[in-house]
């Protein structure tokens, strides 16, 4: 199975690729301004991951057009900037976040929907962002599936299409259940075997996470 990872010029992208590889899939990584919609169609991946990155969704190259063009063709997962690009593609406002957190953790409250299935409620997530999707501007077809205690949107999904976004970084060692989140998404891409690999990987990362908090 091959996943297309759209690289928004971010240093974290290969951590995501590593997690996906550990779950058993191959990744093709393309910069957001070095691939067009026609080429994405020719690649015909099992799913598309829109990576974190600097700047705004409007400056994230192919991301917003890709969501509009192919949102009904393959599962799409947006992470951080990729998450914001999904919101913006559906007309939502992305504005300065009420709290600016870079490398800090927050508790995410959720109901276990979509990629968050099986994660603790709440769970600890690592945040690197100064912008956030404004919930009140989201259209009816996009539902919020995770929030911080203060109400900042941390996860959302389309109600009928396989499109999801998370504002936090699942690939961070300080985030709980990152492998499980990605495995849930890979299952929607047609690779449920990832769910068999996830528990051992989650356990390994959790040991590192607890050690980091204890230090």
Model-derived features with residue positions:
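Phosphate-binding/catalytic loops
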Residues: 160, 165-176
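Catalytic beta-strand/loop cores that center a nucleophilic Ser/Cys/Thr
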Residues: 112-161
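Generic structural signal for residues in well-ordered beta-strands
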Residues: 27-29, 94, 144
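Acyltransferase
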Residues: 173-215
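Short beta-strand segments
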Residues: 5, 126-127, 167
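Cysteine-nucleophile active-site neighborhood
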Residues: 45-118, 122, 182-183
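Histidine-centered divalent metal-coordination motifs
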Residues: 80, 129, 169
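Flexible gly/pro-rich beta->alpha loop and the following alpha-helix that scaffold active-site loops
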Residues: 2-6, 10-78, 90, 190
